Amino acid sequence: MIRVLNINENILEIFKDWNFWLSLITGLTAVIALVLTLMQIRLSNKQSLFERRLECYLKIDGLMQLYKENQKLLETERKDEPLFAVDLEFLWLTNNTYLEEASEAIKKPLENPEHKKFLVKREELKKLSAEAELIFKGRSAKTISCFISDYEQLLFKMYQYQILLNNMRNYSEQFKATLEMAQKGVNETAYREKLLHAYANIKMAYLQVSKNHVMEKLKKQIKL
C-alpha cells in the first residue's frame, strides 16, 4: 500500500514538473517540424521533377511535330545527285520557337553570330537527350533520347553538307569545272552518304517512337 502511494506521489511530482513538460513539448515540436520539413522537401522534389519533365516533354513534342509535318518530303527516295535542297529541309526542321535561333545558320554557314547560335543549340539538344533519359523511366526514356540525338546529328550533317555545297560552287567557279568535276573535287559523294545515313537514322528513330507510343507513355509520367 505504501509502495503504491509512493508511485502515485512520483507520478504527481512528474505532472507538477514544468521542466519535464517543457522538454517533452520541445521534443515533440522538433519531431513534428522535422516531419513537416521532410514532407516539404519531398513535395518540392516532386514539383521540381514535374516541371523538368513537362518542359522536356514540350520541347520533344515540338521536334516530333516538325518531323511529322515534313515526314513525306524528308523520307522521299533520293536520286544519285547532290542534295541541293538541304538548306530548305534544314529550315523545315528548325521551324519552331525552340530551334528558330539556329535556322539562320544554314544561310551563311561558319559565319558569326549565326554559327555560334547553331553550336549553342546543338549543345542544348545534346543536353535535352541526356536529360530525357535521366528524368523519364523505362525503355521510353532511351527511345526518345535516341530520337533527340539523331535529330541533332541530322541538323549537324545538313549543316556540314551545306558547307560542302558552297565549296563545290566555289570550286566550279574557280576552275571552270563541270558539276561532276566539282563533285569529285570536294569529295561530295562521301559527305552525301553520311547525310543520307543521318536521314535513315532519324527515320528509324521516329518510327520507334511512334510505333511504341512513346509520347503517350512519357505524358503519363508527367504527374505530381
Spell out what each predicted region is:
Residues 2-51:
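Membrane-embedded hydrophobic alpha-helical segments
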Residues 2-9, 91-224:
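An amphipathic alpha-helical interaction surface
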Residues 14, 63, 217, 221:
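Residues that form generic nucleotide/phosphate-binding pockets
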